[in-house]
């Protein structure tokens, strides 16, 4: 459990560092090519790694092709293209907004489970969601609530970032459909399909 928590922490920290780097890169390349180049390279590395670890049989779809295309599209097309498009359109403030929107993923996951699967969260989860939301608001605004008055000028950008984040949440939840597969196998096949769609 501790190893899993550490893995999640490292992934979150990596994501946080990704947006400042992307801010510089997006001055020279649009979000579509940025996503394609990044995950095209990642897909090749994952294919080699999966082939070495699990062999050719790991590339069999086992009747889950449509699901893999859907979840791959959610992660590697919807998430990557929209979150970087929103960040690019917002300019410098997009770095902070995109980073903080990532912090809302647990809240979004709980809301999706509550609305779609009727899995009502426990009281402590709702309390945690509210605290997380308030914390995110204070970080985004730096305590300056007049920030909300400027949202009308950035609604499209915010919508792109939010939809992108929802896409990633759906992707991670989709891992349950392949629970008998390794994380590497699910990641590789969805990355290949998602990058192809991009």
Annotate the PLM regions.
Residues 46, 121-143, 198:
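Hydrophobic transmembrane alpha-helices of multi-pass small-molecule transport proteins
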Residues 33-44, 83-120:
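Specific alpha-helical transmembrane segments that line the substrate/conduction pathway
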């Amino acid at each position: 459990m501790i190893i899993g928590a550490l893995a999640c922490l490292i992934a979150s920290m990596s994501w946080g560092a990704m947006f400042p780097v992307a801010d510089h890169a997006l001055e020279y390349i649009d979000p579509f090519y940025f996503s394609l180049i990044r995950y095209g390279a990642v897909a090749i590395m994952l294919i080699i790694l999966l082939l070495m670890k699990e062999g050719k049989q790991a590339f069999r779809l086992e009747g889950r092709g449509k699901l893999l295309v859907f979840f791959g599209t959610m992660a590697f097309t919807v998430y990557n293209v929209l979150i970087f498009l929103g960040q690019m359109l917002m300019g410098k403030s997009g770095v902070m907004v995109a980073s903080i929107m990532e912090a809302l993923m647990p809240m979004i996951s709980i809301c999706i489970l509550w609305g779609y699967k009727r899995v009502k969260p426990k009281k402590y989860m709702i309390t945690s969601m509210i605290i997380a939301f308030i914390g995110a608001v204070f970080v985004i605004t730096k305590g300056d609530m007049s920030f909300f008055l400027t949202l009308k000028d950035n609604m499209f950008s915010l919508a792109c970032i939010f939809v992108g984040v929802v896409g990633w949440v759906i992707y991670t939840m989709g891992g349950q459909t392949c629970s008998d597969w390794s994380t590497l196998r699910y990641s590789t096949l969805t990355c290949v399909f998602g990058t192809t769609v991009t």
